[in-house]
Structure formats: C-alpha cells, structure tokens
C-alpha cells in the first residue's frame, strides 16, 4: 500500500473523530483559522472535482432507467425537508428569522458528496447514489436560490446572480469537468487520478470544516437556551432526513441497496457548500445552523449505517453477500 493509500485509509477510518476535532479547534482558535475563509471557494471547487471523478454522463442514465427512487429522493431533499426546516424555524424561533434562514439554507443545499463514501460502506446502490449526487450538484446553482426565494421571499436580501455564479464555480463547473474527464478517458481517470486525489479531498473537507467552525465561536462562547434549542432542532432535522428516506424506500418496497442509498442521500447534505454561502451572503446568525451540522453529521451517518445493517433485510442481504464469497 502506497503512502497516499495509507493516508486515505486512515482519514476514511477516522473521519468522524477528525471532524469533531477540527470543529473544536476552529471554535477554540477562531482568530488563527478564520483567514482560511478567504479561500473556501477554491477549496470547495477542488473537493467537488476530486469527488466527482467516479462517473460520467453515461452514469446519469441510471436516473432515466430507475426514475422513481431518484424522484422521491429529490422530493425529500428539496421539497419536504426545506418545508419542515421552515416550519421548525417559524415555530421555534419566531423572534429570530435569521435562524430560520439558516435552517432553510441547510436544507436547500444539495446532497453531500460524502454520501458516495457512506453508500459504499453501507453496501448501497453506488450507481444510483452517483447519479443523484452528480445531478443534484449540477442543479445546485439554480435550486438553492430558487428555494430561498420561494420559501423566504423578502425576508432575505441576496444577490441571486452572484450566488449562481459562485455556485457554478464551486460546484457545477468542477463536476462537469470531472465527468468529462471520466467520459473521455473511458473511466481510467477513476482508477488512476481519483485515488491519488482522494486523501487530499478528505483533507480539504477537514480544512473547510475548520474554517466553517470559526463562525460558531461567537455563539458558543456565550451559549444561551435559544442556541441549545437551535442545536437540538438541527440534530432532529438531520435524523428526520435519514428516517424519511428509509421509510420512503419501504413504501416503494425497494431492495436493501436502494434503501441504503435513499436513506443516506436524503440525510447527508453538502454542509461545506452551505457554510460557504452563509459566510458570503448572509449575516453571522445564518451560519450557526449550517456550521454546527458537521459536528455530528458524520458520526450520525456511521450510526445510521449500523442500524440499517441491523435491520431484517440488512442482515439477510449481508448474509447473502458473505455466502456468495
């Protein structure tokens, strides 16, 4: 195993713990690490490119071949969860509209690229996951401003054109470039370049988490009952996304790999993108709901995968896989 492979394996195995550590460092030393925020857009563009090298335009055809699960995932991601976030914000924080804005922003952003890693670990349908991630990533420059405009309207003043442009730079263009390289090299780039970039993509995510956490420091230094309530709301919505994805899969009578993908894609969000947007376009209070999520998202996802494996269908699927070896 090469040094890069060892580093990648170490980061992948300990990512949940490392994320918590980087969040704590960012909160503890915000003055030292806050300058990183000036480079978050470039860092995010690199992370998107590196994580999108695993598929091309042909993989997107999976959406057309099995449209219903993908449509349901998108409905949960961009209709159900944003509406629930809006309702939670208005119900719990009627005097703090910026907290409501932060909750809605958190559930307007696309599904997380990290879901590719977790779906693979969870024995899910990786082809479907890749299609969802790529399509959602490409649509993000248009879906995010539209969701904020429809749900928040005049509550939020934002430069929509600038936001779309920055999302194109951070998300859409890097993803399209990666897909084009995959297509032109007939997939060779996934076996050669992607593994070499993988540890650097994970390190980039940790740096982004560190930068995002610096924005939480002012809040956590003066913790209040309202902030505790906000943290609980963020955690509850996070769990709800996973739960709705899994229950939707059960209603569709989907097989276990599809159920894993629907649950994880519905629950994992691209928090780094939300934090970059919150820092660039909104007051500080908007950042807190978004920036706090990385503290527990990865650890929660690890627990969700174990729960899925412990279900009756999960045990049967894993046992069948062991017998076929």
Can you say where each PLM-predicted feature lies in the sequence?
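Alpha-helical transmembrane segments of multi-pass small-molecule/ion transporters
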Residues: 1-325
């Amino acid at each position: 195993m090469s040094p890069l492979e060892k580093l990648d394996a170490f980061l992948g195995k300990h990512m949940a713990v490392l994320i918590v550590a980087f969040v704590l460092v960012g909160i503890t030393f915000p003055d030292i690490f806050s300058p990183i925020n000036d480079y978050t857009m470039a860092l995010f563009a690199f992370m998107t490119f590196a994580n999108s090298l695993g598929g091309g335009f042909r993989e997107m055809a999976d959406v057309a071949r099995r449209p219903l699960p993908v449509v349901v995932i998108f409905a949960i991601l961009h209709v159900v969860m944003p509406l629930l976030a809006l309702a939670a914000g208005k119900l719990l924080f009627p005097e703090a509209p910026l907290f409501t804005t932060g909750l809605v922003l958190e559930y307007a952003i696309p599904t997380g690229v990290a879901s590719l890693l977790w779906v693979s670990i969870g024995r899910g349908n990786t082809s479907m996951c890749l299609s969802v991630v790529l399509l959602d990533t490409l649509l993000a420059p248009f879906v995010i401003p539209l969701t904020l405009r429809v749900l928040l309207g005049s509550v939020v003043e934002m430069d929509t054109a600038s936001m779309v442009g920055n999302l194109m730079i951070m998300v859409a263009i890097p993803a399209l470039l990666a897909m084009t390289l995959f297509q032109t090299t007939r997939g060779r780039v996934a076996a050669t370049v992607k593994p070499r970039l993988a540890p650097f993509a994970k390190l980039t995510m940790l740096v982004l988490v560190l930068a995002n956490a610096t924005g939480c420091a002012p809040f956590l230094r003066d913790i209040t009952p309202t902030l505790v309530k906000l943290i609980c709301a963020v955690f509850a919505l996070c769990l709800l996304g996973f739960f709705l994805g899994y229950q939707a899969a059960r209603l569709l009578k989907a097989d276990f790999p599809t159920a894993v993908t629907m649950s994880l894609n519905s629950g994992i969000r691209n928090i780094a993108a939300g934090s970059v947007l919150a820092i660039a376009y909104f007051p500080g209070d908007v950042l807190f709901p978004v920036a706090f999520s990385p503290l527990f998202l990865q650890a929660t996802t690890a627990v969700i995968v174990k729960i899925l494996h412990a279900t009756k269908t999960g045990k049967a699927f894993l046992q069948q896989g062991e017998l076929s070896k």
